[in-house]
Every structure is written in structure tokens, then in C-alpha cells.
């Protein structure tokens, strides 16, 4: 709405189990509307479960996403069978801004709302907020228990922004994309029955190594029996090398690094993941390798999305890698990959159970969601790196990040698929050599979402722009239109 009336409308695409009883899927696509105060896109509530809708807004040039959300909980004492609706979509708002480089205004509700038709109740606890294109929280309404506030308007919280400041950040985020790698996988409809997915739940122990100082500890690293242990990145090298030295120390497949990694896995009768500079002719790749208990290399992945530092010595790879093991389907990635949300989409679509990510130093950008919006006992706010946290949640898989510790911060962590209400976010303690957690894969049910439901609910008919080159005539036509679906062949 503007001073002259309606400017544009958006009809919700992401529908949850309650929504489908009342609504049909939207038919407006994700539009971006030019206004005197900036280019604005609209997203509704459960849309946040899917990374694609806010990405489509960014691809169409949005500067601001206006997001109508909720912060609902099930009522205290709700039986477990009915408690699967326990969630908090407003606790997802940071990913829209951080991954897409846009301003995000997330408005949520307050108080206890009752449905007069079926008698159900929503237990809203406030927390509306505004976020910068860098993924930083600018202002937030207090989180207030619903018993203390009636439903309705209980305050307006504001800050001053310059919408155009999003443009450079957004374009930087989008420039890291490689649409040729996503085509056609991210635009395909996945069948409800997927033979590639892990069918039988199985227990798995996950471990993320934590190293301090610059030295490598590869020679002394080994997993526990049938454990998946992920080491920090460039696992066989000191962490203070420049690009020229990293290139000089690059080695071919089957070289000293892979041999040492395989010996460590065999000695511990488990699975060991690390990364190294791999030389192949004149090219050097940042390669992640997975070794198994038999002392062999089970899979290799060449990083597809490089950080600025990696670009000074590495060539990007050209495909994601998922390895089927007795522990489940293990995907391989690097920390830099996680900044590009399409990578999460690829591994989700390939039915990854655990994503193994050798990482480096702790990131400056942490989870900034108000801890009061979480139902878990130890919220990740302020201590967990944001990108692995987001990847696990948006991809609905477990993520293990081996990393280094600097002062009070660490890149070593284990990230669960439903960190708001159900699964822990674990970071290695000071002085610990690793953090460990035993769980079940595929990620157990008990909440309102899982990987299968995530795939079933996708609107792949809207996703063609995600896999098109930005110079493609069809993409350009879709972007210029501003709203409405893509009609190109």
C-alpha cells in the first residue's frame, strides 16, 4: 500500500501443513515493486522455510523485503502428537538479509490468537525486527510472553535506512553464483518418493575438530570407531601461508595428504574429512576428501564457490559431491561455499544427511537472532557462525564444521536442521580438541518440517530464473517485468 492505494500484491507460495487446509498456492510469483522509497518485495511467513523465494526477490533487484511473519509456539502442556507445530518463523529473518544483501523488515504478532472455527490457538511472543544487507540486526521489538500482551498492535519500531545501499551488497552476493552448476537440478520437480534418499534411519556420531594456533594436527587426528570427524580446512598445512606458498605445496590426488588422511581414518575405524590444495596439471583446486575405515578415499570434492582469498590460488570445481556410506549420505563442501545459498539447495536436492565442511578461522558474522525466540535450552546467539547454521536449517541436514579457535570464538561446530525448537547448535568449548554429538539420520521427525517435506512443498514451476544466466534474454525479460512468472520456454 502507498499513499495512492495498492501498489502491488503477493500471494504466498510456501504452504505448511495448516496452510494447505485453507489456502491454495500463490499465482503471483515473487514480485518487486518500484516505489518512491525503494524497490520492495513481499514474503509471507512460511515462505522463509525455502531459500528460493527471497533469492528470487534479490535476482529481481529488490532493495527491501517486507516479511509478514509469526513467532508462534504451541501452548504449554500441548501433547507431543500436537506439538509438531512448535516453531518460530521470525527466528529465520537473518538469512534473508545476510544471504541476499537486502534490507529486511520482519513484522510478527503478539498475544494468544484463537481460531473460532477449529478452536486452535497460536502463542505469539513478538520480536519484530529490521536487518541490514550485511545480515546485522538494526532494531527489534521486545520478546514478550503472549500472556502479557493482547493480540493486535502493541508498538511500532523503526530505524532510518538508505535503500540504495543494498544494491552493491546484493550484486556482490549474486555475483558469486554459478547458474550453470544449478541447471537443471534446482528447477526440477523432485518426486515424493526419492530412491536416492536414505530410507532406513541409523545412528551416527558426528565430531568437529577444533585446532588452536597455526600448526596442522593432521598426523595425530583420527576418528572414533564409526564416527565422522571433520578437520579444519587445508588440514595438512599451517594456517598462516600466503597464496604462493599454498600453490607451491599443492599435491596430486593420492599424494601425501590423502595417504595420511586415509591412515587416520583406518587407525580409528571411522570416517575422516579434510581439505588440501590439489594440483591437476597447471591448475590447483581446493579439494575436500573423505576417507573411510578401510583406509581408502571414498570421495573428493573441488570447491565450486571460492572466497576472495581462495581465488588467489585456486580454480573452482564444477560439481557437488555426495557419498553414500553406512553412516548415511555425506556431502562435501567448504566454508566459502556456504555463503552461496544455491549450494545448500544443491545438497538438499541431492538428499544429503550430513554436510562435512572443513572451515578455517571463526567468522565475524554470528547468529544474532534474539535468544528468547528459541525454545532450545542453549540458543546459538552470539557464539555460532551464521553460514553453517543457515545451511543446516535451510537444507534440513546435519552440518559438521571442523575449524580453528581464536580467543573466545570458534569455527568448530555441529549444526542441526531445526535449531529453533528441536536440535542443538553445538560449538567446541575452549580447550576442547573437538565437539561430538550422537544423533540419527535422516534427521528425525518431531517438528513441523523435514527434508522430504521441504522438497515436497517446493514451487519448482517458479524456479527457472534461479538456473538461468543473468545475461539470458529470458532472465532479462523476467527481471524487467518486475512481477509475474517467467513465460519463456
State where each predicted segment sits.
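Short beta-strand segments enriched in small/hydrophobic residues
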Residues: 194-213
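Short beta-strand-to-loop element that shapes/binds the nucleotide-sugar donor at the catalytic cleft/hinge
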Residues: 274-279
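Short, acidic, Ser/Thr-enriched surface-loop or helix-capping motifs
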Residues: 1-2, 131-133, 239, 292-293, ...
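Active-site catalytic loop in hydrolytic enzyme cores
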Residues: 1-91, 95, 150-153, 162, ...
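Metal-dependent catalytic neighborhoods of phosphoester/phosphodiester hydrolases
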Residues: 235-253, 281-284
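Catalytic domains of carbohydrate-active enzymes, especially glycoside hydrolases
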Residues: 218-237
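C-terminal functional modules
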Residues: 460, 464-489
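CN hydrolase (nitrilase-like) catalytic-core segments centered on the catalytic cysteine
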Residues: 48-157, 250-273, 339-437
